[in-house]
Structure formats: C-alpha cells, structure tokens
Amino acid sequence: MASYPSGSGKPKAKYPFKKRASLQASTAAPEARGGLGAPPLQSARSLPGPAPCLKHFPLDLRTSMDGKCKEIAEELFTRSLAESELRSAPYEFPEESPIEQLEERRQRLERQISQDVKLEPDILLRAKQDFLKTDSDSDLQLYKEQGEGQGDRSLRERDVLEREFQRVTISGEEKCGVPFTDLLDAAKSVVRALFIREKYMALSLQSFCPTTRRYLQQLAEKPLETRTYEQGPDTPVSADAPVHPPALEQHPYEHCEPSTMPGDLGLGLRMVRGVVHVYTRREPDEHCSEVELPYPDLQEFVADVNVLMALIINGPIKSFCYRRLQYLSSKFQMHVLLNEMKELAAQKKVPHRDFYNIRKVDTHIHASSCMNQKHLLRFIKRAMKRHLEEIVHVEQGREQTLREVFESMNLTAYDLSVDTLDVHADRNTFHRFDKFNAKYNPIGESVLREIFIKTDNRVSGKYFAHIIKEVMSDLEESKYQNAELRLSIYGRSRDEWDKLARWAVMHRVHSPNVRWLVQVPRLFDVYRTKGQLANFQEMLENIFLPLFEATVHPASHPELHLFLEHVDGFDSVDDESKPENHVFNLESPLPEAWVEEDNPPYAYYLYYTFANMAMLNHLRRQRGFHTFVLRPHCGEAGPIHHLVSAFMLAENISHGLLLRKAPVLQYLYYLAQIGIAMSPLSNNSLFLSYHRNPLPEYLSRGLMVSLSTDDPLQFHFTKEPLMEEYSIATQVWKLSSCDMCELARNSVLMSGFSHKVKSHWLGPNYTKEGPEGNDIRRTNVPDIRVGYRYETLCQELALITQAVQSEMLETIPEEAGITMSPGPQ
C-alpha cells in the first residue's frame, strides 16, 4: 500500500481555525520516525504541557534496548507478516522446552556462581540460616512492617487475617532466582510498560488497578488521574443493604421528549486527521478557538508500541517473566494444598449463599446470538402462527409476507427443526471463521437473519426486540445472572446510531440485568470494495460524530441520548486470523487518505477508536454524562502485537488466548490486572481445543479472568448458557467452589454495571484493596482467597519497584558528583 508522509509527496491540509495556545511540540522519542531518511509525520496534537510519559518518569528507566526499539519492532512486524507459519515465534516459548537456548541457561548459572564466590562467610552463614527457617512468623512480621504507611488498611483486620490461613514465604538474598543485573533490567522494563498503560488509561478516563497505581506512585512525582467511581450524596450503600438493588421507579426510556433533555452547548464539531475536534462555535471559522480535550499523540503512540514490541522479545526479560509466572502457578498450588479446607469451611459458614445465588455477569456475549437454537426455533414457529400475513421483507421492490418468504423456501412450520435451522457450530468450523459466520443465517438463508435477528429491517426490528426481551426475562427470573450484550454499528451511514437507539426506545428493550456494548466490525475493506465508503475517515465520522452531537446537543438525538446512558463502551470485532498487509507506523496513510481496498491493521482501528473515545469521554464528563471504555476482542488468533495494542489502550479484553505464548505480556497483564473474558466452548469450536485452553493456568497465576459464553446460539444447548459454561469448566478442570465464586466475582468487577449496583452485589467496600473490599456474605469468596491474591500481587509489585528504587539509590551519589562539576561546553 502506498504511504503518504505528511512532510513530502502530499500537501498538508490547512484548516482556518486557531490552534489553542496550550499546545506544545511533541516529545516523542526520535526513533519513532516512520523510516530512515523520511521526515516524521506531523503530530496531530499532544496533550497540553509535557508528555505524560516523560513527566511521569522521574527515574532513569533506560535500558540497553532503548536505541533499538524501532528496529526490533519493525523486524518483529515483518516476521509476523512473512513468517506466519513459524512453529515457534520469537516472542514465545516452545511447549516442549521452557528455555529456547541452553546456552543462555549456562551463562546465567556461571554468573550466579561467580557472584556466590564473592560472598563473605558471614553473609553465607546468614543466608543459610534464613534458608533453614521453618517458622514464617518473623517473615510475616517483617512484611507487615514494610507495608505500614502504604495505605489506611486496618492492622487489626490484617493480624486476624494472618492467623486465618497458611502462607509460603521465600527467604534469601536473591528471592527471584535470577542475578540482580537481570532483575534490574527486567524490573525497569516492566515498570516502564506499566507507566505507559497508566498514561493511556488516565488519558481516556478508564480504570487502572489501584494496587498497581499505588506502587507506581512510589516511583513517580505526580499520580495520573484515572477513572474512579464517585459516590454522590444520594448513593451510599450501607453494609446491611439488600443484595438486590432497588427497582427503578419508572422505565428509563419513559421521558424521551426533547424539552426534557439537557441544554445545547452550541459547540462546533469537525473531524480532522481521523479525530473529532470540538470548537467554540457551531460553524467553525477563523475567529473560533478549539476546546481543550486531550487525545493521544500519534507519534508518541507509535514510539510506545515500539518500546513494548522490543520488550516482549528480549531474552532475559522473557526468561524472568516466565520464571515469575511459573512461580505464581506453583505458589497457588501450594496455597490450595494448605488452605483448601479452610476456604471451604469459610464458605459453609455463610448462610443462604452458594454459587447459584451469587452475581455472575456474562461479560462477552453478542445480542444477535444470545438465545439458544431451540429458543430461536420456537420463536420462529410462533411468529409463523401469529404473524403469517405480516409484511416482513422487500425483495427487488416487491413486499413479501412471512408466508411468502417461507413458501419461496418451500418450508412450513412443521418442517422446521433444530437440524434444519443449522445454526450450531460443528467440527467443520474449526479454523474456518467464514463457515462460522455463515451459521448466523438460519437454514442458510440471509433473509431469515435479516427478519429475525436484525434491528434495521422492514418491521423495524420488532421480532429481534421480542426475542431479546424474552432472553432478558429469563435473566430476570434467574435473579443472579446478568449479561452485557453486543449490538453492532458498522459505520456505513450517519443514521445508524439513531436507528439503533430508536429500536431500543420504541420497543422498550431494557432490563436491570443487561447492559449494552457497541461492537464495530473491522470490515472497511468490504464497504470500500462495494463503494459504500470513500475513505476510512468517512467510516470514523459515521461512528463518532453522532455521539458527539448527542453529547453537545442531546435534544437533537433524544433517543440516542437515553440509549447511551446504558452503553458501557466499544468493542472491535472480526476474524483476527486474517492476514494484515500493512504495519501501522508514522508513514501509514491518515484516515482521509486511506482509500485503498485493503483493510487497515488492528492497531490502526484501535488507535483511532481510542482517540475519539478519549475526546468523547472528556466532553461527556464535563456534562455529567456516562463515559465509555474500550473492551475489544483480542488475542483469539493472529499476531501477538494485537495484545500489545490492547495492553496500552483497552480496559478489558475478550479471549486473550495468545497470552499463553507471550510470557512478558502475560506477566504485564497480571501486574495491571487487566480483565480477560474467556469463552472456552467458543474457542473449542473455532481455534483451540478445550483441554488446551489456558484459563485454569491464568486463574492459578492470578490474572483477572472470567467465564463468558460469546455465542450461545452457536455453542450452547441449554436455557442458561452461562451456567452451562461454568458447569463444563468445573467438570473438566476440577475447579473448586471457591474457584467458581472467584470467577463470578471477577466478572462483576470487570463489568460495566454502575457503582451503586456493584455495591449491592459485592458490598459497599468493594473498591477497597484486599480482603477489606470483600464481603463473603455477598460474593461467597473467602477472605483467605482474596487475601492471598492481594498479598501475592503486592509482593510481585514490590519485587520490581524495590529493584528500581535500589538501583536509583546506588546511582544517586555518582550522578550528584557528575552534576556538581559541569563538563566542557
């Protein structure tokens, strides 16, 4: 694909608007340029003031990779394009051997021996005594003293907790099992990666793990602001509040009159270089100024991607992270051996609470396939009996009734069965995403999909609304099951949002057990080939301009304004295994110049979705409206750099299977506690057999994972697909009751339900760290398990932050001596 650097070959577009005075030059690293000898792309716009990443790095986090990040990243991108059939990728460990090169192990052993020889005899004696300790009380006391002052946690509750379960402690000079030099390089790189994620979460008002933030603040001058739940004066929930939130007094779509909407801000909107800009006048001209709304700088984003790409293939860092992950797995197995009976006893002491009546959220499920195949079959038969003469379709300008549609297929209600419906995935869909997509068409006919599971059709989505409401009714009847349904916005026309919101409001499709996410399929190449879009920026305008308009002037989109209050965020969906023919860098065409029929890469979609969402979130927060998060499909298949982009930009992800091949990324996802909604039954039919699914491994190591169904229409058989998912996972992997309840609690924590609702479901203190944030009366998760997870995470974070701090203390005298006598000019 042709590239269009902004500095040459194409004149830069001029816009007759005043730039705001607070903008400063980009501070991205020089290696972020698109290619050798080519001028850098003109930065779209940076945040006001210094770049957050540099402002937030008071320490020297430079490593030996810093000057080579761009070259390493480009080489890895090239390999992912040209060598997709490699048996062992450069960023992963082969399954048969934990270490790729035995030479690396030999050199590491030699370094370890050389360091041990230099130890003094008294140090050796002390290390031996520490190793032979059998009583861990002193270690626990030391750990408790080191943790004092890091928060306002109650010491009494902590003392009680320490007596409740058995701990395993590691003593000695080098507790991590690698030489200090390797630990220092790995710690600096991991801390740098966590700072990068914190910066982008703060920029978009998404959440960031509070425990991780607290440890990073020890290394930073000023903490960044991230998304937090704020309690208003009328929202506090008492400790004895009921588990079920109070019912709404009226339907949320009751008042849809424009006169009841918030006022008009009178701001102007225009998309520039792929991002919506907001101006002080409705019709922007040379006399208006730009409203200060931050979004990520493109040059800085590419530089950050290069840093992370170089990080995940660094040999010593890869070995360090692999060792830490193996340690976490072994430590959890030891914890289970020592405390399993205590956890079970703690659960049995709680009255009227078990796995069946704790809150569970299906955090990854598509609305068009949220029903099982028997449910859809019964609904179609019922529609054929009651609405046979209703006009439901237009074929070549001719209206057709439901009777005529089925007569053209030579079918009657009696002929229909689950087998003729043919919507269930089978062995032929494995690694065939095209055949899986065809399963969305009942009886193989796209016309039936349009009639029954589409929101925009001849009957205004009436049938789809009815079947969704039946699914909602089943969820409400179960009380404790909830779902976050995905609805699609394609970006082909500007009125898609209004049609979707009108469908929800007109048919009153709402339930307290359901929240919405909006998925954007990555299908620009299809629309461009059909001539439906002129360039990629037109697709972005169709997706985001209506949202900005509904935020600036809600009365202009009344249904959309009401609907958005129940939308959690955005999802990016499509087949990740499709080859990408382009690498996203500074030489990539801007959205208005992307007119090729090739599809933009995954990172391109994610960056421009994130940039517009960040601007929109700041505007909506100023108005007191609900903000959004980014929760894409990621890591199901395809190249590993999808997970790199999601680590930087996404609050949660769905699938994450490829993390099993990337120990550095898996360790980073653990430290940042990024939510991962996993669907083993879906993966079993498409990409990975059930027994190879990494979910039990992720869970044992402490990653924030939950179970989800993905597509019950294709993969499940029962009326309760989420319970079916839990049931099979428990039987196959022999999960304990505590494991199941922990998965359910994780699903609520990573969901988009409101703070008040979560306070009822999990307890009013659920935002606190550690066991203080757990209420076993509501979650059925023992404080023992929550305390273990919290202490283990704190120990891992302390390991890397203390290594960085110790290196900083050692270099302070040298740096002070250098700066006191300035060198020659």
UniProtKB/Swiss-Prot annotation:
This protein is called what? AMP deaminase 2
Assembly and partners are described as: Homotetramer.
Q: How is the cofactor bound?
A: Binds 1 zinc ion per subunit.
Q: Which family does it belong to?
A: Belongs to the metallo-dependent hydrolases superfamily. Adenosine and AMP deaminases family.
Which organism is the protein's source?
Answer: Homo sapiens (Human)
Tissue and organ expression note: Highly expressed in cerebellum.
Give the first-level EC class, as a single word. Answer: hydrolase
Can you tell me which residues the record assigns to a coiled coil?
none
- What InterPro entries has UniProt attached to this entry? A/AMP_deam_AS, AMPD, Metal_Hydrolase
Q: Where does Zn(2+) bind?
A: H364, H366, H633, D710
Q: What is the lineage of its organism?
A: Eukaryota, Metazoa, Chordata, Craniata, Vertebrata
- Please name the SUPFAM superfamilies in this protein's record: Metallo-dependent hydrolases
Q: What reaction gets catalysed by this protein?
A: AMP + H2O + H(+) = IMP + NH4(+)
List cofactor names only.
Answer: Zn(2+)
Region entry Disordered, spans:
1-49
Q: Which residues carry this modification: Phosphothreonine?
A: T134
Encoding gene (name):
AMPD2
Q: Which Pfam families match?
A: AMP_deaminase
Positions of post-translational Phosphotyrosine modification:
Y91
**According to the UniProt entry, what is the EC number of this protein?**
3.5.4.6
Bias class Basic residues marks the residues at 11-21
Residues modified as Phosphoserine are S22, S46, S64, S80, S97, S114, S136, S138
Q: Which CDD domains match?
A: AMPD
Q: Which key words are in the record?
A: Disease variant, Hereditary spastic paraplegia, Hydrolase, Metal-binding, Methylation, Neurodegeneration, Nucleotide metabolism, Phosphoprotein, Zinc
| Sites where the protein binds substrate | H366, K435, F436, N437, A438, K439, Y440, E636, D711, P712, L713, Q714
Q: Active site at which residues?
A: H655 (proton acceptor)
Q: In which pathway does it act?
A: Purine metabolism; IMP biosynthesis via salvage pathway; IMP from AMP: step 1/1
